């Protein structure tokens, strides 16, 4: 990185950047697309913030949560010499939004934070294009991947958004990008020869523990007993909104300053909890997965899961809220075997076929239609039409480009076939989600080193047990060392290698063990195969 920019970063933000951060910044300043996969708390936001100091134009930051947008704006405001930042979202008053746009037009703003559903609007794109965009930064970029654990269809339009903004460099940032997700991010954002940084996933300072329970009442009591005795800021993750209040009330009765948090609360209520936690007025936040992306609190000491997350990806991201100050932290998962059935139920859901057909029929057989006109033409609500359109785009039945939404020449040409294509895609994704839940069960039930298993899921192997998890402490990790991702067969089946299976199609090798291999298949999700079967029956072919 240029010495002048390095000095400027120190003067403005007080930061000394690491080489990996600088390498991504250099790529962006050379007008090259970049994908950075870095652990939670490793300074991903610093990349676009410092890059903004060296660019001539706006940095547009796509962020999925209002809380995350506001946190970043407040953080930048704490640095008096930093370029001005504004967040444009539905919680803002009309006057505040108008003032922010005036400042953008006048060249007084360096960073604009938006949600993806706002960024696709024609008037928003026109204003940004007129102001001049130097960089599009996509935060939580795994949300664009249908193979990611937090797929958000609104992200699908971002590749086209970049084109409509004049195709500035695109920077994608995420903490949970396994090889298949990284490939999907690059493809869906239309990235061109991107610089890809995938630093290690290990957070060795977080102690990993799992506790199995036979009964729900026993599990609930164990969670309350544990959290009531913990010392330090704590996040408790639960599966339902009702559980946030139940646990928060129980913990408050035990003397902890606990508050519930979920997406169904009013914005002001969520912000009050969020601010109270950051300021130290709230000790424990009991939350659904809605709480997390916007947390920039370095001294969280514990993350406790009262219910199993829907995937290892979600688990990894949520425990990553702990110990960002590099001090020791802990993560405990409480579960019953039945909890995995609950998560399987949560994994399903797709738009109605009638809505899909209506949207497909609203798109002309030749030519295109603007997104803004599609809602009225389909005769649906904006939300329903948007879900159906995203499903059709994801299935490859429609495409969205600078001219608008159009049919794919070699895709389905009638509504019934288009609806079947989206149903097939939904079934495919459900199989993938079920495989993620199965992998989460394996993590919970393994007697091997949990960190070895966790890292192996992401293709980041650990040769020896970590020494900082419950199975290492109990001694079972050493006894079970033949069944962990240790890279024993990497020579024949290296991580990230592409393979072909007769039934499941193309896949990517995630990790190998002494006697097995784990592969992610696009049509079937995660599958663990015995190496003896692979070799004797030629189940896999390198491609």
Residue ranges: model-predicted function:
Residues 1-3, 481-488, 540-543:
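Actinobacteria-biased recognition of intrinsically disordered, low-complexity terminal regions
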Residues 282, 308-317, 323-500, 508-510, ...:
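C-terminal accessory region of SF2 helicases/translocases
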Residues 502-543:
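Basic/aromatic-rich interaction segments and small domains that mediate binding to polyanionic partners
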Residues 246, 301, 491, 514-516:
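Long, compositionally biased intrinsically disordered regions
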Residues 3-11, 16-45, 51-57, 67-361, ...:
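Helicase motor core with emphasis on the C-terminal RecA-like subdomain
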Residues 60:
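Gly/serine-rich nucleotide phosphate-binding loop at the start of the catalytic core
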């Amino acid at each position: 990185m240029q010495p002048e920019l390095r000095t400027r970063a120190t003067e403005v933000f007080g930061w000394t950047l690491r080489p990996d951060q600088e390498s991504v910044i250099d790529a962006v300043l050379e007008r090259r697309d970049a994908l950075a996969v870095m652990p939670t708390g490793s300074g991903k936001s610093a990349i676009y913030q410092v890059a903004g100091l060296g660019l001539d134009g706006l940095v547009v930051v796509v962020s999925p949560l209002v809380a995350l947008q506001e946190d970043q704006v407040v953080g930048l405001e704490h640095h008096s010499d930093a370029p001005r930042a504004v967040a444009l979202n539905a919680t803002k008053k009309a006057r505040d939004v108008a003032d922010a746009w005036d400042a953008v037009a006048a060249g007084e703003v360096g960073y604009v934070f938006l949600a993806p559903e706002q960024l696709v609007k024609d008037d928003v794109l026109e204003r940004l294009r007129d102001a001049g965009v130097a960089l599009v930064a996509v935060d939580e970029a795994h949300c664009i991947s249908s193979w990611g654990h937090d797929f958000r269809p609104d992200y699908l339009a971002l590749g086209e958004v970049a084109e409509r903004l004049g195709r500035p460099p695109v920077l994608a940032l995420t903490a949970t990008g396994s090889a298949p997700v990284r490939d999907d991010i690059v493809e869906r954002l239309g990235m061109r020869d991107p610089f890809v940084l995938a630093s290690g996933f290990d957070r060795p300072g977080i102690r990993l523990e799992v506790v199995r329970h036979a009964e729900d009442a026993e599990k609930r009591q164990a969670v309350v007993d544990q959290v009531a005795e913990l010392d330090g800021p704590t996040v408790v993750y639960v599966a339902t909104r009702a559980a946030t209040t139940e646990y928060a009330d129980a913990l408050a009765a035990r003397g902890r300053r606990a508050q519930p948090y979920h997406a169904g609360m009013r914005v002001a209520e969520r912000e009050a909890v969020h601010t109270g936690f950051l300021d130290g007025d709230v000790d424990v936040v009991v939350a659904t997965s809605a709480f997390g992306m916007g947390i920039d609190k370095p001294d969280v000491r514990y993350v406790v899961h009262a219910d199993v997350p829907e995937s290892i990806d979600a688990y990894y991201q949520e425990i990553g809220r702990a110990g960002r100050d590099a001090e020791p932290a802990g993560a405990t998962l409480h579960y019953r075997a039945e909890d995995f059935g609950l998560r399987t139920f949560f994994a399903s859901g797709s738009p109605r076929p009638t809505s899909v057909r209506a949207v497909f029929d609203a798109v002309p057989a030749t030519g295109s239609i603007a997104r803004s006109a599609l809602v009225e033409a389909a005769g649906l609500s904006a939300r329903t039409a948007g879900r159906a359109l995203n499903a059709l785009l994801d299935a490859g039945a429609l495409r969205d480009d600078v001219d608008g939404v159009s049919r794919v020449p070699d895709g389905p040409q009638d509504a019934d076939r288009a609806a079947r294509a989206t149903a097939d895609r939904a079934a495919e994704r459900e199989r993938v989600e079920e495989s993620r839940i199965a992998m989460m069960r394996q993590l919970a039930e393994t007697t091997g080193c949990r960190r070895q298993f966790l890292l192996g899921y992401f293709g980041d192997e650990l040769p020896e047990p970590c020494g900082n998890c419950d199975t290492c402490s109990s001694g079972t990790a050493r006894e079970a060392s033949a069944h962990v991702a240790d890279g024993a067969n990497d020579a024949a089946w290296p991580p990230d290698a592409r393979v072909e299976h007769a039934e499941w199609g193309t896949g990517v090798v995630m990790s190998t063990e002494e006697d097995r291999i784990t592969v992610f298949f696009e049509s079937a999700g995660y599958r663990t195969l015995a190496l003896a079967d692979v070799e004797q029956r030629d189940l896999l072919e390198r491609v």
